[in-house]
């Protein structure tokens, strides 16, 4: 067996720990659980009056989850709340750890690396609106090894929904100085195996990935809650099923749920995922030019069509004659179309491209 004892476990998570490249324009950086806890308030709205705990410890997170039988709480009755001042993340980034957990399944070892953030940033909807932002973010990368030899088999790059997650075979995994490389998307933090523009949801919520800021974090070893090596005072956050992020208000469900769920092995069937196309940085530049040109054409023909309709059905003047009234009506109609487009973009991103 490749894995024998706890000393092996720490050395294994260290050996396969990745190098991350963040986008050079990133403004929401990673953070540690301890940093989040000491700057947060844990709220339980199921008591009367509500119970507030601050600063928070891992033992607090474990105890409140145990109190409610480790049930998933999504309604905003239990919240680990923190303010916007934490959104930029913890500095210096070189001191921020990631978390590594080892599981075995079907003759394979899975190392689950977890990265924490205080903020998931916004997506720009073709430059007209932003959507997808929310407090807190947890990203996952999984390394699959042969249980007997320790040979690298695959790497799972976690990125948002199943539509963009991907298992990458060992031969195609990027390496640098013997380390696996993962590229982190701008603001949304999805992980990918190479830089470029990730085409998502028909271009509505693209991810932008580049070889920008290098981050090679140390790994804190954690264990599953059912393991005899599990230490609640150090790992209690992994048992937390309440809302991670948001205000202290009852019913605030703006934060995420799932710190505990991020410790599971993802579906190992690669066919279950639908990874998007990643365009190279060079190709992306041309695509942006084409996209901007297409948007201008669309706007032009919308305005042109509205003007003609205004002339025909409202003004009823000679063809091609547009007066002040026509332009006012055109502006109003066009503004309404833009608002509809923005609402549609928000709906599509939140429903089909969750962050």
Predicted regions and their residues:
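A domain-level signal for the mature, folded cores of soluble proteins
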Residues: 1-137, 150-289
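Juxtamembrane boundary at the C-terminal end of a transmembrane helix
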Residues: 344-355
